Amino acid sequence: MQISLYQKNLADWTGSIIAVGLLEGQIQEQLSLLEEICDYDSLLTHVEEKDFSAKAGELIKLEILGKSLEKIILIGLGKPEALSIDDLREGAALASRASIGSKGKIGILFPWEPFNPISASKAVAEAMRLSIFKDLRFQSEPKPQNNPQSIDLIGLPESNHNIIKEVDPICSGVELARELVAAPPNELTPAALAEKAVEIAKKFKWNYKILNRKECEKEGMGAYLAVSQGSDLEPQFIHLTYKPNGQIKRRIAMVGKGLTFDSGGYNLKVGASQIEMMKYDMGGSAAVIGAARAIGELAPVDTEVHFIVAACENMVNGSAVHPGDIIKASNGTTIEINNTDAEGRLTLADALIYACKLEPDAIVDLATLTGACVIALGEEIAGLWVESDELANELKDASSACGEKLWRMPLQASYKEGLKSMLADIKNTGPRSGGSITAALFLKEFISNGIKWAHIDIAGTCWTDKDRGIDPAGATGFGVRTLVNWACKSNPDIEK
C-alpha cells in the first residue's frame, strides 16, 4: 500500500474514490469542498435520500457522481465538539474496508484542522493499512482480497512525508506480531519463535543469544524450566540486543511472555477457559518481537534495547510439574506452585531476573497474564502496573499517541498477603479476588532495587473475535506500537 500526502488543489486530484469524513451539523458545509470534482447537487440529494446524519460509525457509498470519480464514501465522525484522533482512526478503518476491491487511487478527506498534522497523518495511515490485514497462510486455496494500493491523504502538508515513511516499519511489526499470535501451536513452536527472532537479529546485524535447556539450567532458571518440563519441545530463551550508533543515554528491556501453547498443566484448562485458543498465550512475546522488527528499521537514537522472551509450552506428561511442587527461581526465591495454570508468571520471573542483570534503566513486560484483567478492563484496554510515575507517563504518552489504551492499576502492597506460603518464600497465585493485582505483585518480587519496571497485562487486548476499530478479527498485535513509540521517543520524527 502506497500512502502519500496531497496538498494541492482538490480540482487537480486524480483518483477513482474519495472518502470524506463528516461531522454532525456540518454536512452541507463540508461537502461543498467536493463541488469541483463531482455533481454537487446530485450528491446532496443522495445524502438526503439516505438520511445520512454523520453519526459516528455511519457510512454510505455513492456510485459514479460525475467527472473522474467512480465512488464517494461518506463516513460519520460524530459531534464536532467530541472529535478525537481516535475518531479519525475509526473513520479511516471504515474507509479502508469499504474500499476493498477497488482498483484506482483513493483519496481521504477528513477534518484535519483540530489536530497536529503529524499525529493525524500517522494515525490515519496506520489505520488504513492495519484495518485490512488478512492472514491467508493456512488456507489450501487462498483467495487474496483486492486491497487498495494507492491512497492520498488530501489536505495534509506534503512536508510531513517523512512521518509516512515510519508507518511501513511500524505496521510491518504489528503484522508480524499478528501472524505469530495467529499461527497454530503445531507451527509456532518455541524453536520456531526463536528462529523468527534470530532472523530479525541477523537482518539488522544485532547480537543475540538463544539459550537451550542446559544453558538455562546453568543460569538456575528453575521457575521457567519447571513450566517447560511437561513438554517434549525444548524451551528457547531468547535475547536480542539493539545498540545505536553514537552515545548511549538510555538502556531499556522489553520482556514478553512466550507460552506458545498453554494447556494449563495438571490444572487443566476446561470448559470456558478456551484451551483451543491458548496459542495466543505468547501474545506478549509477539509484541516484543514485532517491536524488534520495527525498531530495527527505525533505529532509536541514544537508546539501547534488549528484547527478552522465555519461550516454552505448558503441557501435561509424566514429567510435568505438580500442583504443590516447590521450585527455585534464578535469584534463589523458592516458589510453591499451587496452580500449574498460573505458569506465565513463573517463566517471567526468570526472564525478569535475567533482564535485571543487564542493569537497564527500565524494564517493561507484556503478558497475556490474567483473566481477572479481562474482567476488570474488557477487551479494548490493557492493564498497566508501575510504581514509577515517570515510567508510567512515558508509557501512557507512547500508548495514547498510537491509540493503544492502557489503564494504570494499583500495586496494592497489602494484597501480597495472599501470596504467602507456609513452606516456600511465595506462592504463585493468591485468592481469586484481585487476581490481576496479585499477579503483578508476584512479578515485582523478581525486580532488582533501583530498576524501574512496568507490567502490561494484554490478556483481553491481544485477540478480537470480530472487526474492532483498526483491528480485523483475529490477532491484534497490541503493544507493538506502544513499545516502538517508547523506544523511539528521542527520534526527531517519532510522534511524542
Curated annotation (Swiss-Prot):
UniProt cofactor(s): Mn(2+)
Upper classification of the organism: Bacteria, Bacillati, Cyanobacteriota, Cyanophyceae, Synechococcales
EC number(s) reported in the record: 3.4.11.1, 3.4.11.10
Protein's UniProt keywords contain Cytoplasm: yes
One Pfam family matching this protein: Peptidase_M17_N
Name of the featured protein: Probable cytosol aminopeptidase
Binding residue positions for Mn(2+) 2: 257, 262, 281, 343
Example of a GO biological process term: proteolysis
Gene Ontology cellular-component annotations: cytoplasm
Record-stated family: Belongs to the peptidase M17 family.
Native species: Prochlorococcus marinus (strain SARG / CCMP1375 / SS120)
InterPro entries linked to this entry: Leucine_aapep/pepB (IPR011356), Macro_dom-like (IPR043472), Peptidase_M17_C (IPR000819), Peptidase_M17_leu_NH2_pept (IPR023042), Peptidase_M17_N (IPR008283)
GO MF term list: manganese ion binding; metalloaminopeptidase activity
Keyword Metal-binding: yes
Active-site residue numbers: 269, 345
HAMAP family (UniProt xref): Cytosol_peptidase_M17
Catalytic activity, reaction form: Release of an N-terminal amino acid, Xaa-|-Yaa-, in which Xaa is preferably Leu, but may be other amino acids including Pro although not Arg or Lys, and Yaa may be Pro. Amino acid amides and methyl esters are also readily hydrolyzed, but rates on arylamides are exceedingly low; Release of an N-terminal amino acid, preferentially leucine, but not glutamic or aspartic acids
Gene assigned in the entry: pepA
Superkingdom per UniProt: Bacteria
Binding site for Mn(2+) 1: 262, 341, 343
Coiled coil: none
Record PANTHER family: CYTOSOL AMINOPEPTIDASE (PTHR11963:SF23), LEUCINE AMINOPEPTIDASE-RELATED (PTHR11963)
Location(s) in or outside the cell: Cytoplasm
